[in-house]
């Protein structure tokens, strides 16, 4: 009988039962904790989907050179263009003139949050806001954008219109502002007595002409919250402004 003790197989030695080599204790710890395995960059971390494992990930979340270095190592392709957080172009940025010509700066990556800034004539700022903020509220409510009006940095004859939201919201709101300015200028060019907001029906002292239809009907747009003419509107903004036909 062989009385010699059989020694325990050393870690890393051949395992006759398993048909291979056992993993050493250090290797097992590295596998279970992730230590020693962070030798390659995490492609998920550097993608648009992101890595769901956080600090428990077995791959690198920090690589010198960032995305460009990782893309060269893993052939991930060119980096995703970043959306500009300030859509103001060179000089004054975009500008709406008195004729309603646009525009805000370059836009891309729809769905991303951004800020657009463009200039308008200061005389148009009040009409863009509307009586009691009705016009600006309508734009914000319809597009979801946040609209504010600020003083221009250099020209006191201009005001800055600032739009905050997604690029799609900003694009829609910009179109609404452009349309509003166009209608305001069109109404201002109408001769006395012609159409909404042109001053027709008003006498030289700012009173309605006898027999005019000024403020004899309720403004449907005001009832819906989207009248852009304010005090210049020919229709009554509520029962208090309503007058009988032909009565001064």
Swiss-Prot record:
<feature type="region of interest" description="Disordered">
    <location>
        <begin position="87"/>
        <end position="110"/>
    </location>
</feature>
<feature type="zinc finger region" description="C3H1-type 2">
    <location>
        <begin position="213"/>
        <end position="240"/>
    </location>
</feature>
<keyword id="KW-0677">Repeat</keyword>
<dbReference type="InterPro" id="IPR036855">
    <property type="entry name" value="Znf_CCCH_sf"/>
</dbReference>
<dbReference type="InterPro" id="IPR045877">
    <property type="entry name" value="ZFP36-like"/>
</dbReference>
<keyword id="KW-0863">Zinc-finger</keyword>
<feature type="zinc finger region" description="C3H1-type 1">
    <location>
        <begin position="36"/>
        <end position="64"/>
    </location>
</feature>
<dbReference type="GO" id="GO:1900057">
    <property type="term" value="P:positive regulation of leaf senescence"/>
</dbReference>
<dbReference type="GO" id="GO:0003729">
    <property type="term" value="F:mRNA binding"/>
</dbReference>
<dbReference type="Pfam" id="PF00013">
    <property type="entry name" value="KH_1"/>
</dbReference>
<dbReference type="GO" id="GO:0003700">
    <property type="term" value="F:DNA-binding transcription factor activity"/>
</dbReference>
<dbReference type="Pfam" id="PF00642">
    <property type="entry name" value="zf-CCCH"/>
</dbReference>
<dbReference type="Pfam" id="PF14608">
    <property type="entry name" value="zf-CCCH_2"/>
</dbReference>
<keyword id="KW-0479">Metal-binding</keyword>
<protein>
    <recommendedName>
        <fullName>Zinc finger CCCH domain-containing protein 36</fullName>
    </recommendedName>
</protein>
<feature type="domain" description="KH">
    <location>
        <begin position="113"/>
        <end position="177"/>
    </location>
</feature>
<feature type="region of interest" description="Disordered">
    <location>
        <begin position="188"/>
        <end position="209"/>
    </location>
</feature>
<dbReference type="InterPro" id="IPR036612">
    <property type="entry name" value="KH_dom_type_1_sf"/>
</dbReference>
<keyword id="KW-0862">Zinc</keyword>
<dbReference type="GO" id="GO:0008270">
    <property type="term" value="F:zinc ion binding"/>
</dbReference>
<feature type="compositionally biased region" description="Gly residues">
    <location>
        <begin position="90"/>
        <end position="103"/>
    </location>
</feature>
<dbReference type="GO" id="GO:2000028">
    <property type="term" value="P:regulation of photoperiodism, flowering"/>
</dbReference>
<keyword id="KW-0694">RNA-binding</keyword>
<dbReference type="GO" id="GO:0003723">
    <property type="term" value="F:RNA binding"/>
</dbReference>
<keyword id="KW-0238">DNA-binding</keyword>
<dbReference type="InterPro" id="IPR004087">
    <property type="entry name" value="KH_dom"/>
</dbReference>
<dbReference type="GO" id="GO:0006355">
    <property type="term" value="P:regulation of DNA-templated transcription"/>
</dbReference>
<dbReference type="GO" id="GO:0005634">
    <property type="term" value="C:nucleus"/>
</dbReference>
<feature type="region of interest" description="Disordered">
    <location>
        <begin position="1"/>
        <end position="37"/>
    </location>
</feature>
<dbReference type="InterPro" id="IPR004088">
    <property type="entry name" value="KH_dom_type_1"/>
</dbReference>
<feature type="compositionally biased region" description="Gly residues">
    <location>
        <begin position="192"/>
        <end position="204"/>
    </location>
</feature>
<dbReference type="GO" id="GO:0003677">
    <property type="term" value="F:DNA binding"/>
</dbReference>
<dbReference type="InterPro" id="IPR000571">
    <property type="entry name" value="Znf_CCCH"/>
</dbReference>
């Amino acid at each position: 009988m062989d009385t010699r003790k059989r020694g325990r197989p050393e870690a890393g030695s051949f395992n006759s039962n398993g048909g291979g080599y056992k993993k050493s204790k250090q290797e097992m710890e590295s596998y279970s904790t992730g230590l020693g395995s962070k030798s390659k960059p995490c492609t998920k971390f550097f993608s648009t989907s992101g890595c769901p494992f956080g600090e428990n990930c077995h791959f690198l979340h920090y690589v010198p050179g960032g995305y460009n270095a990782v893309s060269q190592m893993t052939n991930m392709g060119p980096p995703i263009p970043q959306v500009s957080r300030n859509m103001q172009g060179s000089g004054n940025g975009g500008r709406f003139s008195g004729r309603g010509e646009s525009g805000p700066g370059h836009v891309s990556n729809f769905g991303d949050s951004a800020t657009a800034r463009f200039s308008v004539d200061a005389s148009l700022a009040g009409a863009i806001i509307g009586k009691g903020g009705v016009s600006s509220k309508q734009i914000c409510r319809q597009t979801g954008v946040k609209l504010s009006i600020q003083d221009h940095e250099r020209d006191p004859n201009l005001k800055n219109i600032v739009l905050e939201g997604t690029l799609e919201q900003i694009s829609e709101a910009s179109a609404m502002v452009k349309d509003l300015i166009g209608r305001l200028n069109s109404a201002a060019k109408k001769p006395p007595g012609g159409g909404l907001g042109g001053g027709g029906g008003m006498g030289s002292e700012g009173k309605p002409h006898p027999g005019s239809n000024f403020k004899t009907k309720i403004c449907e747009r005001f009832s819906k919250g989207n009248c852009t003419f304010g005090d210049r509107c020919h229709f009554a903004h509520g029962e208090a402004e309503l007058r009988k036909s032909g009565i001064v």
